Amino acid sequence: MSRCDLHIHSSFSARSQEWLFRRFDFPDSYTKPRDLYALLRDRGMDFVTITDHDTIDGNLEIADLKHTFISEEVTTYFPQDPCQLHLLVWGISEAQHAEIVALRENIYDLQGYLQKASISHSVAHPLYSINGKLQASHLERLILLFKHFEGINGLRDALLSELSRDLLSGLTPKKIEELANRHNLQPTHSEPWQKIFTGGSDDHGGKFPASAYTETPRARTAMDFLQHVRTGACTAQGEGGTPLALSHSFYNTLSRFIQDRFTEHLGPSAVLLEAMFSRFMEGRDPTEFTLREKATFIAQGVMSGKIFELAKPANVSLWKGLSKHFARPKVKAQLAKEMEGVAEPERRTFLMANMVCEQLAFRLFEKFVQEIRSGNVIESMQALSGIAPIVVLLSPYIYAFHSQAPSRRWLQGVFRQMTGAIPPPLQNRKRAWFTDTLEDVNGVANTIRKMTAAGVAAGEKLIVITSRRDLTVDDIPIKNFRPIGEFELPEYELQRLSFPPIMQILDYVQREQFSEIIISTPGPMGLTGLLAAKMLNLQTSGIYHTDIPEYVRILTEDRFLESLAWSYMHWLYGQVDTVFVNSEQYRKCWIDRGFAPEKLKILPRGLDTDLFNPTRRDVSFWPGAGANGSEVRLLYVGRISREKDLDVLAAAYHKVRETGLPVKLYLVGLGPYSEALAAALPDAVFLGYLSGEPLARAYASADVFVFPSTTDTFGNVIIEAQASGLPVIVSDLGGPKELVEDRVNGLVTKAHDAEDVARAITLLARDEKLRMRMGEKARKSVLDRSWPDAFQRFWHTTDL
């Protein structure tokens, strides 16, 4: 077999096609043609050619070497159409190059010339839109015009190569006839439904030549090789590109750019920096040098007469700072753990760069939070601004992830138009659910765990992504990223949030090829999920679980902060494709705030009616909890926090007790308000956190469920109590009221009105038959709820 990388660039390529490089006037490549020749031969290529953009100068540099031929990557256009297209043209002469330059503005003229002159050629990266103008109509005409297409491109995302092959392999004579009639354009070649695939690395940085290539039967000469390609006796081999490979090439080009432009200004320290950068690119400690290497640096300094420049404060500071950081035992141990089993230099480099940058970013963020708490706004902004240089250092990675990400929505449109169907890789089959909370005692965590478990049982691909230091949940698919650090929320100190490893999460989402990001919380993980979706062009759903602005108002008593919270919520949920809310009230609320009605969906909720069941009533449950058996048992289940309006419950309970009615209040849950509420309710019983069977027994063994919260958007505890046969008392503000039919299966009271809550408690406490009747109807109202059914409705809402 014979091999040749039929798509590769040298330092003779014109201005870079990458926006990041054009923005800073970086060259497309620094790889010298003769160096490239040696690399390709070392990597098993039998023939060598260079496909620089619209030039053959690089080929002329190696024309005297064996097994070479002249090629180029031609930029061309359809007439009066700004869409850029690239053709790979191989085995040409200087005279033919001149003809190609003259004809390249019109793809029809260019194709005719190439065919007439029997010049081997192929459409490069057919599904990659070079300047954002590519449409299905362009692809349809390319199919009619050309026989050869690049089947594996080693630079662009592997999904694009896979989809290109799928699209072109599925052509039929009938489809070709349809395209010819649509565009009034006859195919230029025989059997146009049978395409030939070529492969090339499209390497620009000199790091990944021959990562993809074209293979033919054994060829004695370059012309024999190209004859095999022309007749279709060839296959595309190798692998598609990744963001890490692209960014690795970027860093290499950047290093060469700095060496080229600034070596004289850097003096002898340039050698040191070059060596450090070389180690960095190999994923090794950039400060760890052998005795021999150190001696070489000193010798070079002596020979140049600039030995003392190496001792300048700036150079010493750089060396000392980096050496000190990498010498720390904790850093060494963490670095060793991260690198264990990782062989690819680009991944080792990525892990090292992220570890250092993320730790620095968290220190600056901690400073920001400290200054905010101290009321030092200017100082806090200064601390936050320090993150900007870190973003600049990581910009090649950030750019690579985004530029490599295929536009799934655009590709779906192309396939719909051209085939009438969406191929499996573009269907919404694998989703990541981002959350800041999973172990906490709240409805958000409960919903995520129940819904995910139902998804697993249904055989769907759903993974929860979070970032917690200590995570004990293991009954559902979870990817937990150890946080860089944690911080407390002001005014809500018991709620700790994580500072997640953002770039590692982005890399994971890209590698796992998720099709949709589900965002459950507006915290750091929710923002990370949104960033990943935007960077990788993924479909998004957001779930508005919690009325955050109302929480902020209650906790801070500050209307300005409440308005800021609303602005943030509006921005966050405005970014996603679909917003799930928990009730019709909140759906109307978001419509009033300008959201399109079709964007807003009600989140289906399930319930385990076998677990939460009146048959679990246990008369022996309460004596152990301090009951005397003759009292009417009032039950609250939920987080013990101020925003749950528990002060209203406390006041109402006191009013009822003052009338002499035999009632006893039991509270299940934990939270930051526990101590204060216990002091306000010395005769109530606090049971702490309960779950599973004990919680089900608590529900079923109570008589009335009281939930005065005005901030909940739904209320899982409401339907759990109803399933247990309890009448429920709720307020007329928030989502829970939509779960209760007033005076049928419960009572709806005025929000923040302790007097009205007391009246409702009194009514039910005095009338056992009313309690029983309402409890029976409450149970019937939720019997049709199940988690499998809720999951199916949720999952298929955003299906393609």
Question: Where are these predicted regions, by residue range?
Answer:
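Conserved donor-binding/catalytic core segment of Leloir-type glycosyltransferases
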Residues: 433, 627-644, 650-654
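Carbohydrate-associated surface elements
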Residues: 468, 585, 606
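Aromatic "clamp/platform" in nucleotide-sugar-dependent glycosyltransferases that forms part
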Residues: 710
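Short alpha-helical donor nucleotide-sugar binding micro-motif in glycosyltransferases
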Residues: 690, 697-702
